[in-house]
Amino acid sequence: MKFQQKPSVCIPIISNPNKHPSDVSIIGMYFLFTDGEEQYINFTHPDEIDSDISLQDIHLHSKTLVFNKKTLVYNNITDGIDVNSYLHYYISDHINPHEFYPKGMEILAKKFYKIEDLGQVIPLSKQFEWARKIAKYVMRVYIENPIDQNCIDYCNDFINVFHEIEKNDILVGDETKKQNYMWYTATGRPSNAWDGFNFSAMNKKDGSRDKIRSRFEDGKIVQFDYDAFHIKLLAKILDYQFEYHPYEQIQNDLHMDIDYDQFKGKVFQNIYGTITPEFMNHTFFRSVQALIDEMYSLYETDGLVKSWFYEKRFSDIQDATPNKVFNYVLQSLETEYNVRKIKSILPHLKNKKSVFMMYLYDAFIFDIHPEEMNLIHILQSAFETDNMSVKIYSGDDFGHIKQI
């Protein structure tokens, strides 16, 4: 049997679907090709004689859609396009694999939940039946939404960037915790949770952050946090020039004699909520309102709007309003800008002991080795492009980082 390298939907059969992608092996693969042909490959499942194709022989077509691509990346196969990223890009959807379980497979998966090699226990025929159901659903979307270069860039950039962060376990107390970034959320803002620990929801006041510390003796947890991030992002896409710090300039222009932190809160409310008459007196916010109106007009006319950098589609927004549509685009703008930024940052860590430890919305957290403290200044320069500036925080643990 020879592997056919042509466009398809690929569903890996893995050793245990309940484990982290870094802890599983690929025991088989199912392919549904665009011409309707199917191919089944068994590597190690006991139900059938192993095929004469090994995992190392698999070289996917560049436009093959791969379900759960993370598992392949951890197994050193980087070809193909992640299915959930693709679905999220075009139809704001993603696949819950449990919803496609055939009846017998669902029963076995629940009964033998704690079995180490669950994938070896469930009959291969049931797993191929499950894979076929997913592939046929994806193929219907695939035929209606041909893959373009923006989609390829989006899917590959997101899977590769978050893999480079996710592969670094985090030291929490005396144990290491795995990360699991999931970016196919409604707004595109990634979550990060695994095995009952939610890094994205860590409270700053309950002490949970105090347990996160450096993996290196005398190492430092260092966070880079953009200053006035959303307002500068909007200024970038609106081609609006501030003469000095945006918050200070807007406050002075509007003659608002209130506490600075209180004013920042008002700015945030006017960006993400309705722009008040007071703020409409400023040319920047009039430009923002014009953009809000333009986005909503496009949504009403075309039934969708597209993200700024990768042109990801947003459609079927529930109870859509001008501000809600704009919020979707704005939050995707934040994430897409940061993914592109991380992509440019990662080469600075090549051959370094220090690691990119975690991404938390518009904050970037690194575990810096004591011999590489000069890396902080290198990273600062890399972050501070596009008129952006960062605040830098450092500490022995994540809960006690202080601005430096």
Residue positions per predicted region:
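Non-catalytic, well-ordered alpha-helical scaffold segments
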Residues: 24, 125-132, 136, 152-159, ...
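Conserved RNase H-like, two-metal-ion catalytic cores of nucleic-acid enzymes
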Residues: 1-102
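Positively charged interface segments
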Residues: 374-391
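Short His-Asn-centered micro-motif
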Residues: 66-69, 224-226, 270, 368
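Conserved catalytic core of nucleic-acid polymerases
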Residues: 167, 252-359, 368, 386-390, ...
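Acidic, glycine-rich two-metal-ion catalytic cores of nucleic acid-processing enzymes
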Residues: 18-35, 43-47, 174-258, 311-349, ...
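Short secondary-structure junctions
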Residues: 63-65, 115-117, 352-357
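Mixed-charge, glycine-rich, non-catalytic linkers/tails in nucleic-acid processing enzymes
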Residues: 75-103, 107-112, 116-175, 240-242
